[in-house]
């Protein structure tokens, strides 16, 4: 029996340490117990190499309470979506309003601030707003994909949306005459248009180049110029995009 006794925890269990959420995780490829901050989920992950050592991971997390508190304090606040809020969608300021009927995007005839109108309150309202944002994301990202694919002389790929935690887009090259497949994070709609467009160009370049070699980056630069500012923006603000739609 280990120093920490029989396993008292399960993979995926959650603890609270220093007021912060800590998730226990088994990773059989890990060599030791460790802690890391997951900024996209707003939590700390305590990893153990086996189920038997999860208790050790939990004890390690409790022993590092001060570190956990300091790191979690650096995270952007969780941002709910409520009537009266103003958010940016592809860099445009958008107002959120409560209204009866189907959730929808409204472009005022006078050219003023667009509005997302949705029913409900609390999480129900937020879910309805996110559906509208996803529809905008699908439309804009598909348009930009068609634009960049045409510039590259590549066939228009199949487009999908998801909510991945570790990447903003992914590309599977087409084989044997079949179209490629590109999936984007819907949260790109919450980034400036130029940043989202860079991600589209990046994934479209993968329709021709599977790696990140010089030819790949030359394709990207031809479409959107220097990618460095856009990559830096995502590193600096990516965690904030994942905080949207999460109650504070």
Predicted regions and their residues:
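Walker B catalytic acidic pair
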Residues: 203
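Active-site-proximal or metal-binding-adjacent scaffold patches in catalytic folds
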Residues: 1-198, 207-248
């Amino acid at each position: 029996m280990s120093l920490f006794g029989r396993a008292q925890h399960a993979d995926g269990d959650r603890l609270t340490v220093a007021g912060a959420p800590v998730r226990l995780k088994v990773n059989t490829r890990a060599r030791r117990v460790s802690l890391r901050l997951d900024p996209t989920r707003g939590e700390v992950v305590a990893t153990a190499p086996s189920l038997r050592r999860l208790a050790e991971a939990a004890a390690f997390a409790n022993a590092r309470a001060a570190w956990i508190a300091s790191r979690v304090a650096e995270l952007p606040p969780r941002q709910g979506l409520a009537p009266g809020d103003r958010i940016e969608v592809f860099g445009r300021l958008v107002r959120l309003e409560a209204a009866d009927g189907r959730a929808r995007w409204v472009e005022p005839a006078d050219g003023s601030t667009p509005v997302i109108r949705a029913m409900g309150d609390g999480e129900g309202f937020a879910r309805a707003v996110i559906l509208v944002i996803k529809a905008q994301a699908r439309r804009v990202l598909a348009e930009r994909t068609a634009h960049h694919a045409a510039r590259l002389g590549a066939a228009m790929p199949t487009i999908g949306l998801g909510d991945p935690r570790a990447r903003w887009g992914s590309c599977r090259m087409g084989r044997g005459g079949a179209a490629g497949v590109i999936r984007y994070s819907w949260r790109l709609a919450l980034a400036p248009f130029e940043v989202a467009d860079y991600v589209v160009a990046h994934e479209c370049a993968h329709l021709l180049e599977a790696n990140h070699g010089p030819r790949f980056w030359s394709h990207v630069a031809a479409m959107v110029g220097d990618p460095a500012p856009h990559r830096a923006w995502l590193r600096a603000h990516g965690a904030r995009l994942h905080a949207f739609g999460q109650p504070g």
